[in-house]
């Protein structure tokens, strides 16, 4: 008279990943680090776009900006971090900064080059006698 539940517990099969095509298996690559390996000590310092007013900088207390540097053409140490040894500007995809920051950085680097603060090309041994 009693109805008993005699169902067997089903095994849980792990779901397989579905790929759209066979080529996607071969083309998957691991992406490298966004920061260049030029420095032995650590990563690049993140730049900050200069505010139009100093009051804007003081109001934003919730953002941690103490470890960042403001983009300026006079700040050689910051600008040299975003330039290769050959003198080329490091692209945005390698540094991991935003498009707006890259634009400001490029303008600052070009201004510093014109004023003679940064070199246009690398210094070769045979060039300077």
From Swiss-Prot:
Gene3D superfamilies (alphabetical): Ribosomal protein S18
Positions of the UniProt region annotated as Disordered: 1-20
Keywords for this protein: Chloroplast, Plastid, Ribonucleoprotein, Ribosomal protein, RNA-binding, rRNA-binding
Species in which this protein is naturally found: Stigeoclonium helveticum
Stated family: Belongs to the bacterial ribosomal protein bS18 family.
Description of how the protein assembles with itself and partners: Part of the 30S ribosomal subunit.
Domain of life: Eukaryota
An annotated Gene Ontology molecular function: structural constituent of ribosome
InterPro entries assigned to the protein according to its UniProt record, in alphabetical order: Ribosomal_bS18, Ribosomal_bS18_sf
Primary residence: plastid
Gene Ontology biological-process annotations: translation
GO CC terms, sorted: chloroplast; mitochondrial small ribosomal subunit
Compartments in which it is found: Plastid, Chloroplast
Protein's UniProt name: Small ribosomal subunit protein bS18c
């Amino acid at each position: 008279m009693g109805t008993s539940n005699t169902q067997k517990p089903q095994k849980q099969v792990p779901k397989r990943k579905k790929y759209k095509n066979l080529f996607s298996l071969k083309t998957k690559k691991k992406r490298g680090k966004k920061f260049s390996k030029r420095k032995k000590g650590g990563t690049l310092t993140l730049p900050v776009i200069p505010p139009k007013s100093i009051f804007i900088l003081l109001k934003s207390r919730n953002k941690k900006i103490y470890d960042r540097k403001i983009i300026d053409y006079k700040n050689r140490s910051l600008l040299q971090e975003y330039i290769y040894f050959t003198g080329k500007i490091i692209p945005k995809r390698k540094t991991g900064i935003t498009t707006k920051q890259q634009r400001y950085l490029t303008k600052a680097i070009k201004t510093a080059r014109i004023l003679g603060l940064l070199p246009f090309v690398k210094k070769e041994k045979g060039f300077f006698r």
